[in-house]
Amino acid sequence: AWVLITQAREGNKLRGYSFCTLERIGGTPSLLVGLALVDRTSRAESALKAIMADQYRRALLAFPDEDVLLGTRLLTPEGFRAFNGLQDVVPFPGHKSSGEERAWARRLSKRFGCESRLDDRTFVLKGDGSVAGGLDFVAPKVKIPEGVETHFDSFKADRGDRLVAFGWAMAEDLAGGRLGR
C-alpha cells in the first residue's frame, strides 16, 4: 500500500488534508481514504474538491485504464459530496444492498481495522468511544443527496460511529479528469 497525504491550501492557510492509500483489495484497484478533514468555512467545498481531484489524479497514475473503488468512513451526510461523479455509490436511501455490496462493506471495514463493529445491513460502524478516523466534511449551504441523512439518524459521531461508504470511479472519468471538479 502507498501512504499518500494530500493538502488543500489557500495561500499560507491549510484548509484541508487527507491520508489515503492506493492498493488492490482482492485484485480490485482501490482508493481508501482513512482520514480527511476540511475546515468548516464557506470555502470548504472547494477544499474538498481539490483534495479529491488530487487523489483521483494519483489513482489514474497507479491504475491506468481501470475502474477504481473509492472507500471511506463518513462522519456526516455532507461527506457524500466526496462521491460526486462516481457510479454505484453505496449505501443510498431506498436501496436494498446486495450481497456483493455488503461484502465490500465488510472488506473495507476489515481494512479500516473495525470489522467486528460493522452492521452490514446499515453499513454503520458502531463506535466504542475510541478515536476513529473518517472523512470529516461539513460546509454551509452544501447540497447533499436527498435522503442520505437517514443513514445518520441513530448515529453518534462523538462516540466513534461511522458510515462505511463506497463508489466506483470509472476509468474514462478518471482519464478525462472529470472527477473532483
Predicted regions and their residues:
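A conserved beta-strand-loop-helix scaffold within acyl/acetyltransferase catalytic domains
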Residues: 1-41, 59, 74-76
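Generic hydrophobic/packing signal
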Residues: 7, 37, 46, 70, ...
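Short amphipathic alpha-helical surface micro-motifs
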Residues: 13-19, 50-55, 144-151
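Internal, hydrophobic cores of structured domains that mediate oligomerization or house catalytic pockets
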Residues: 31-37, 51-69
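Conserved acetyl-CoA pyrophosphate-binding loop and the N-cap/start of the following alpha-helix
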Residues: 42-51
